[in-house]
C-alpha cells in the first residue's frame, strides 16, 4: 500500500505548539496578516468598484439637472440576490426612492406653474396712467369717522378669531377690524334697521359680519363669498352711510358728485343694485334724513333721463363700464369728489375685457379712493392682479373662491342633443314656478322660448341681442310672478337676485366652470334650498366635465356614472402648492398647465398677431 502524500498546509497555523506558548512577535504577525485573494477575484472587485462610481456619477448629474439635492451614500444600497440586504429593506428603499422621485416631479410642476402665472400676469398695476406716470402711491387707507362699539374694541383678538372660525370666515391683511354680529352694533340708523326687517333680514350673514365693519373702517377690500350670501348689502349700506355723513356736513350742490361709484358688468345687475340703494335712501328720507340721490347710468337708456338726476347733484352712481366711460369722456360726469369705488363681479369684468375701461375710469379720480372688489369666483391670478389697485387690502373669504353654494342640490343628467328640448318639459315638472333656464347661445334661447310658448308655458327670454326695454320688461314680469319661466344667456347669471326661484336648468354645460357656479347660484339664496339640473352629453369639453366632477365631490353631491369614469391621471397632482386646481380659471379638475381657458386665450392672441389696422381713423378702407 502506497503512502499517501502529506496534506499541504499554509505557513500560518492557529495551533499552539505543544509544550510552549506563542511569542508576542507571533501575535503581532497574526494581527497584520492579510488573507490571500486570487487574481481573478481581485479583478472582479475592481470592476464592481468602477461600475459603482460610474453609476453614482450619472445619478448625481441627473439630480443636478432636475434641481434636487444629491443624495448621500446611504441611498446606494446594492440590490439583488447577491446583496446582504433583506427583501423587506430592499422594498422600503425602493419605496423611498419612488416617493423622492414623486416629490421632485411636484416641485417641477410648481416651478412650471409659477413661470406660466408670471407670463400671463399683467405687468402694469391696476392703477390710472396718471398715478403710474407721477409715481403716486398711497401708504395708508382712507380714514372715516366710524368706529366699532367700545365693548367690541375691548374684546380680545382670541374672541374675534373664535367668531371667524365659527362662521368659516378666512381673513388676510394687517389690522383687520373686528367682526360684528348685529346690524344695530354696526351703528346703522333705525330706518335702515326697519327696512332690513321688512325684507326678512334679521341677522348679518358671514360675509356681512366681517365685511361691513371692514368697509365702514375705510379699508380697501376683496370680498369672496358664494352666490346668494348677501354681498350686495356689504357695499351698498356703507356707501349710503358715507353719503349721508357728507350731505349732513355740507349739502351737495348742482352738478356735484357722485361721492360713491358702483360698477357692474351687466345692465340688469346695475338696475338691481340701483333699486336696493333707492329703497334704503327712501326709508331714510321718510325718517327725516336728507334726500340722497342715486343715478343709474347704463346702456340702452336715454342719456337725457340719466343727466336729469346728475344735474341736481348726485350722491351715488351705479353704472356699467361702457356708458360710464362715454359720460366721462364727454365731461357729463365728474369723479373729482368720488372717494368710494365698488366693483361688483370684479373678476368677470377684468376677465371679460373691461380691464382697459376700468383703468381709464381710474384715471378720472382726483385723489385717493376706497376700492372694493366682490365676486363669488376669484381665481388667484385675478386676486394678485386686483391687489395692485388696493392700499393695505383686507381679503375676506367665506368658503373657497369659486365653490358652489351648499344650499343647491346639483343634479347632472346625460341627455342627447336631439332629446334636450323634449326632456326640458319633464324637468319643469320637478318644482313649482318660477324656473330659470340657461343656454350658452342666443339662438338656443330663442328656440327654447318659442318651443315653451307653443306648449302653453308662460315664458320670457333675455339675451344680449334684445333691446334694453324688452330685457327690462321681461325681468320685471318674471320677478313679479306674471311669467313662470325665464330663458336667458349668461347675461342673467351674474348677481341677479330672484328670491323665489327653486329650480335652475342648464340647457347646456357652460364652457367655463365659473359660469356654472354663477348660474346655479340664482337658486338656493338667503338660506333657502334650490335644485340645479344640468344637461351634459358628448359635445361637452372633457376638461370642464372634470372640473364639474371635482365641484360635485367638494359639495358632497351625487356624481353620475358618466362623470365617475372620467380620470385626470395623477389626482394627487391637483392639490399641490397649497392651492387646489387651476390658479388661472379656478377649475378644480385640472392645473394651470392644462387649462383650456388659458390655451384658448393664447391661441386668440397668436391669431391676432399681424392683424392690426394700419389705416388712420378718418381714412376710408378701399
From Swiss-Prot:
Q: Which UniProt keywords apply?
A: Acetylation, ATP-binding, Cytoplasm, Disease variant, Helicase, Hydrolase, Isopeptide bond, Metal-binding, mRNA processing, mRNA splicing, Nucleotide-binding, Nucleus, Phosphoprotein, RNA-binding, Spliceosome, Ubl conjugation, Zinc, Zinc-finger
Q: Which residues carry this modification: Phosphoserine?
A: 4, 21, 23
Task: Specify residue ranges for compositional bias: Basic and acidic residues.
Answer: 1-15
Motif DEAD box, residue numbers? 344-347
Q: Where is this cross-link: Glycyl lysine isopeptide (Lys-Gly) (interchain with G-Cter in SUMO2)?
A: 416, 442
- Residues annotated as carrying N6-acetyllysine in the record are 9
User: What outcome is documented for mutating residue 115 to R in this protein?
Assistant: Complete loss of TRIM21-mediated ubiquitination
Q: Which segments constitute the Helicase C-terminal domain?
A: 407-567
Q: Where are the zinc fingers (CCHC-type)?
A: 580-597
- Which residues are recorded as binding ATP? 225-232
- Matching SMART domains: DEXDc, HELICc
Mind listing the GO biological process terms from this record?
A: apoptotic process; cell differentiation; cell population proliferation; cellular response to interferon-beta; cGAS/STING signaling pathway; defense response to virus; mRNA splicing, via spliceosome; positive regulation of transcription by RNA polymerase II
Organism from which the protein derives? Homo sapiens
Name of the protein in question: Probable ATP-dependent RNA helicase DDX41
Q: What does the UniProt record report as the effect of altering residue 345 to A in this chain?
A: Complete loss of ATP-hydrolysis activity
Sequence segments annotated as region (Disordered): 1-39, 52-84
Which Gene Ontology MF annotations are present? ATP binding; ATP hydrolysis activity; DNA binding; mRNA binding; RNA binding; RNA helicase activity; zinc ion binding
User: Which reaction(s) does its UniProt entry say it catalyses?
Assistant: ATP + H2O = ADP + phosphate + H(+)
Q: Which disease is it linked to?
A: Myeloproliferative/lymphoproliferative neoplasms, familial: A familial cancer predisposition syndrome with incomplete penetrance, characterized by increased susceptibility to myeloid neoplasms and rarely to lymphoid malignancies. MPLPF inheritance is autosomal dominant.
According to the UniProt entry, what is the EC number of this protein? 3.6.4.13
Looking at the record, the residues that make up the Helicase ATP-binding domain are: 212-396
Q: What subcellular locations does the record give?
A: Nucleus; Cytoplasm
